[in-house]
C-alpha cells in the first residue's frame, strides 16, 4: 500500500455541489435544468453521472489519516464545504488547518510557514 495519508487542500464535497455553486456564483444560473442535463450527458458519454462523483462518500470510507486544509475566504470551493468533509471522516486520524483570509488554493502562499509545519507534523505522526 503506497498511500500513507492524505493532505486534502480546498476539497469539495461533490461534483454536483461544486458545479451548481459555480453556476450560481459565476453566471447567476439555477442548477435546474442545466445540471440535470449535463449529468445525463456525462452518463451517456463517459459512463458516470454527477451523483456518482461524491467525494464526501470517499472520505466517509477512507481509513487513512487525512489532513483537511481550507482557506476561510475561499469562494471558488466554498469554505462551507470543509466542515461536512471533516465530519464525514469517521475512521482513522484526522486534523484540520483553516487558513485565515486565504482564497482558493492560496493557503500555502499566504501561510507558508504554518502550512508547512502542519503538513510535516501530520505526516510525521
Language model features: what each stretch is:
Residues 1-48:
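Hydrolase active-site cap/lid region
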Residues 6, 96-97:
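Hydrophobic/aromatic anchor residues within beta-strands of the central parallel beta-sheet
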Residues 41-58, 64:
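Active-site nucleophile elbow and catalytic-triad environment of alpha/beta-hydrolase enzymes
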Residues 55, 64, 78-87:
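Short alpha-helix in the alpha/beta-hydrolase fold that links the catalytic acid
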Residues 61-63, 68-70, 74:
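Short beta-strand/loop motif that positions the catalytic acidic residue
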Residues 72-77, 105-106:
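Acidic catalytic loop of the alpha/beta-hydrolase fold
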Residues 102-116:
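Catalytic histidine-centered segment of alpha/beta-hydrolase-like enzymes
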Residues 118-125:
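C-terminal alpha-helix
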Amino acid at each position: 500500500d503506497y498511500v500513507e495519508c492524505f493532505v486534502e487542500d480546498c476539497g469539495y464535497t461533490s461534483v454536483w455541489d461544486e458545479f451548481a455553486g459555480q453556476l450560481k456564483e459565476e453566471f447567476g444560473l439555477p442548477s435546474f435544468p442545466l445540471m440535470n442535463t449535463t449529468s445525463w450527458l456525462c452518463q451517456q458519454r463517459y459512463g458516470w453521472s454527477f451523483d456518482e462523483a461524491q467525494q464526501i462518500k470517499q472520505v466517509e470510507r477512507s481509513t487513512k489519516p487525512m489532513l483537511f486544509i481550507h482557506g476561510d475566504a475561499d469562494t471558488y470551493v466554498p469554505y462551507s464545504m470543509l466542515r461536512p468533509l471533516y465530519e464525514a471522516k469517521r475512521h482513522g486520524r484526522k486534523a484540520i488547518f483553516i487558513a485565515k483570509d486565504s482564497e482558493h488554493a492560496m493557503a500555502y502562499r499566504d501561510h507558508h510557514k504554518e502550512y508547512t509545519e502542519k503538513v510535516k507534523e501530520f505526516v510525521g505522526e
